[in-house]
């Protein structure tokens, strides 16, 4: 069994495509079931965040699994495969393990060292567990990935002074306004990203925090944390003009704000500029807003350019983290290889035991032996089988740790005619 990853991220695909292939919590269970119905996919997990959609799979045929999944991702979102597949990457075996460990440790994140991705990966794993789409391989892989991420965060400085997407958004606002003191902000959404943004905004002196959310009670709870004000999502249009800075991160599949709403808000503001940051995928803010005078719209792709400075500053910590990952990757591969060899070794031993039992049954019946002598013969036969099987099975177990270990398993199966039955 091999580990396979097929996906796209902020480096391989623009936000306009990432939002089209994103998975919502409502559709995820159905998609996980459909994924594991693909012929070459034995286990599957879907990781869908604002910056990536990745399919983690266990398969005996990595090439077939990758090909089937690449087509399936497009079909599952009613897209033309020709528009999706050029942006996909495929990783298998040790490369897939290394990539997954890097993702969990935030080395592959847009913001190097951010903490959100580990929680998102844990949630993706829990969703797959609930859907029954994981098994022995992915269960072990994700547990190993989480332990590796923990080592990276505790043994390196990767998490020190790291920024999040939310804090990067606030830094962008500071570049536009300079001093944020005296400015007001509106958060559309009440999840973790918006809460993080609110904390950074208040730290930098924002005078008023407004919050709206589809679930009004959550908006109230978040606003109260910052002595702010909440209003129902239905009142968004009539309140938009109150904000100098708008940060949006919801799970909506439709635009929350369009150009006409912004034009009306600017009219009420007497054309004072309004700064909008969309950190949602799919996007909350219609891209056409960027064409409106005095409205300055930024999305995840814009933030990606801004946080590159942070990535360069953290290169030394990233190098130390990669050393940990390079050490953990072969450990998982070795376990995976032994997983493949165990059934073969069991079959070899069962075949030897069956031959022993057949011979004992044939000959002992014609021998006039006491119970004690019969027991001695049976013990001798058992010891002989164990002795003869010990070296071949232990050697086979050892050889499977090599890069071409599969061929030794195949050879053993042919020599012992394990697939002839």
Swiss-Prot record:
Substrate binds at residues 49-52, 109, 114-116, 120. GO terms for molecular function: glutamyl-tRNA reductase activity; NADP binding. The active site is at 50 (nucleophile). NADP(+) binds at residues 189-194. The record marks 99 as: Important for activity. It is an enzyme of class 1 (oxidoreductase). Homodimer. Belongs to the glutamyl-tRNA reductase family. Possesses an unusual extended V-shaped dimeric structure with each monomer consisting of three distinct domains arranged along a curved 'spinal' alpha-helix. The N-terminal catalytic domain specifically recognizes the glutamate moiety of the substrate. The second domain is the NADPH-binding domain, and the third C-terminal domain is responsible for dimerization. This is Glutamyl-tRNA reductase. It comes from Magnetococcus marinus (strain ATCC BAA-1437 / JCM 17883 / MC-1). The gene is hemA.
